[in-house]
């Protein structure tokens, strides 16, 4: 109620304690009474816990501390906010009136974040140096949330009642977290033209001939994909099972 957990008034109920009721009725008969009040004889089963129970009040207070948490996940030009509406649905109270966070629900929330924001190895639109829009598929570039560690991170922040902006824990990262995760600094390679274009902050600053893999020898360079640059070397010898090739610069 009013955005907080509150303890409801206990209900005395109408479930009889059979043994107490039997004794009360038996006593009334023996005493020649025409009526007996089972309520006055305390024959109804009492609530297990009352509103003023100190342990229950403490659990409710602790649960409300979590509702003040507000965690903003930063995805560059997009944000996802976890607030009291979401958190209230994650808090589960047990039969002993203690509470915990429902890890299955948190896991599902993080899973949905991954479906929405993970880009690792996915297809994406790309505008080439000459203005063509093509679709690049696969590769080893992109962002991928570490689901298990992000669940643990989110649970810890909620339990602490934190208000903060964070990034998920990532398994793979790119250079830009915006919707266009390639950013404005990248290298475009045309295998057909044997040419490379280096873009920095959206401007082409280098255009140079390159030599890609030898197709006839079975060492072709993968095409139509987005790849992270794992290394760059000068005056290097490329060594394979059946070849050695001297290069002045290699990516």
Language-model features, listed with the residues they occupy:
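Surface-exposed, secretory/extracytoplasmic low-complexity segments enriched in Ser/Thr/Asn/Gly/Pro
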Residues: 1-245, 249
């Amino acid at each position: 109620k009013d955005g907080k957990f509150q303890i409801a008034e206990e209900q005395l109920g109408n479930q009889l304690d059979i043994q107490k009721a039997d004794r009360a009725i038996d006593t009334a008969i023996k005493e020649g009474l025409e009526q007996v009040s089972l309520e006055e004889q305390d024959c109804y089963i009492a609530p297990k816990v009352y509103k003023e129970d100190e342990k229950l009040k403490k659990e409710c207070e602790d649960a409300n501390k979590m509702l003040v948490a507000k965690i903003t996940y930063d995805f560059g030009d997009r944000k996802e906010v976890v607030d009291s509406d979401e958190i209230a649905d994650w808090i589960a109270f047990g039969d002993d009136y203690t509470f915990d966070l429902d890890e299955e629900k948190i896991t599902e929330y993080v899973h949905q974040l991954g479906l929405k924001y993970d880009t690792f190895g996915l297809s994406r639109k790309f505008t080439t140096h000459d203005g063509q829009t093509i679709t690049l598929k696969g590769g080893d570039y992109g962002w991928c949330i570490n689901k298990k560690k992000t669940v643990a991170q989110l649970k810890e922040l909620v339990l602490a009642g934190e208000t903060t902006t964070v990034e998920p824990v990532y398994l793979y990262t790119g250079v830009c977290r915006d919707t266009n995760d390639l950013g404005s600094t990248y290298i475009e390679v045309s295998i057909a033209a044997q040419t490379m274009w280096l873009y920095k902050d959206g401007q082409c600053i280098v255009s140079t001939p390159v030599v890609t893999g030898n197709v006839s020898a079975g060492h072709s360079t993968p095409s139509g994909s987005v790849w992270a640059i794992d290394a760059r070397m000068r005056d290097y010898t490329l060594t394979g099972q059946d070849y050695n090739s001297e290069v002045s610069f290699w990516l």
